[in-house]
Amino acid sequence: MSDAEEEVVEYEEEQEEEDWSEEEEDEQEEAVEEEDGEAEPDPEGEAEAEEDKAEEVGPDEEARDAEDGPVEDSKPKPSRLFMPNLVPPKIPDGERVDFDDIHRKRMEKDLNELQTLIEAHFENRKKEEEELISLKDRIEKRRAERAEQQRIRNEREKERQNRLAEERARREEEENRRKAEDEARKKKALSNMMHFGGYIQKAQTERKSGKRQTEREKKKKILAERRKVLAIDHLNEDQLREKAKELWQSIHNLEAEKFDLQEKFKQQKYEINVLRNRINDNQKVSKTRGKAKVTGRWK
């Protein structure tokens, strides 16, 4: 029911209540008028009532009254108690109130309010169900995202472990190769020491002949001995790969020797500095001891 219809129904109810109140006031006024009409004494009726009373009394009473003498007329007689008749209120025959219509309108109003509440309840329930469905969807989506993130994290961890394993294997391989190279160098050094006498003899002969080589000539000679002619025109693809691996291995060995020599040079330099500092400290101590002895002697 709309607000306009509710206002119309309320206005009709107020009008009906006003009509009822006016009718009740009219009925009360009519009842008061009837009571006033019954309260007024009718002289003719009183006279007839007195006559009937006198007839009922009889001659004996008249004789008794005659003996007693005349009664004083001026004495007031007690009045009868008046009980008004209660008249039920009458419903006027004019415009009658349709209680069925009022009840029906009230029922329709209650029914409309109940229908509105039911619709609001179902709308709220529908919204709650939609929110619950959306919440479940978000939970499932978040769960899938977490599973994907966990899978990516596991893959990255697996790749990292593989890289660490490969790096560890590569280091072990390099360490083994370095040890093998060290053993080879040691063996080569021992073999060179065996032929050291030939080198000494060759140097003595060169010294005797008076021919002295400069450092640049020595360097060129050493490089010429080490550097070989690269003949790769007659090699196929596999042989070229093997040759490239061999050259790379030789470069790697040279770099390793260079690194070892640099570390050895640093160590020797450090030892020289340590020895020099020790010598300087010993010299200072010896000088102070000598001065102390001289001063003590002169005292």
Swiss-Prot record:
SUPFAM superfamilies: Troponin coil-coiled subunits. Phosphorylation at Thr-214 by PRKCA induces significant reduction in myofilament calcium sensitivity and actomyosin ATPase activity. GO terms for cellular component: cardiac myofibril; cardiac Troponin complex; myofibril; sarcomere; sarcoplasm; striated muscle thin filament; troponin complex. It comes from the Eukaryota. Transmembrane segments: none annotated. Residues 137-185, 204-220 have a biased composition (Basic and acidic residues). The modification Phosphoserine is found at S2, S209. GO terms for biological process: actin crosslink formation; atrial cardiac muscle tissue morphogenesis; cardiac muscle contraction; heart development; muscle contraction; muscle filament sliding; negative regulation of ATP-dependent activity; positive regulation of ATP-dependent activity. Keywords: Acetylation, Muscle protein, Phosphoprotein. Residues 1-97, 137-220 are annotated as: Disordered. The modification Phosphothreonine is found at T205, T214, T295. Troponin T is the tropomyosin-binding subunit of troponin, the thin filament regulatory complex which confers calcium-sensitivity to striated muscle actomyosin ATPase activity. This is Troponin T, cardiac muscle. The gene is Tnnt2.
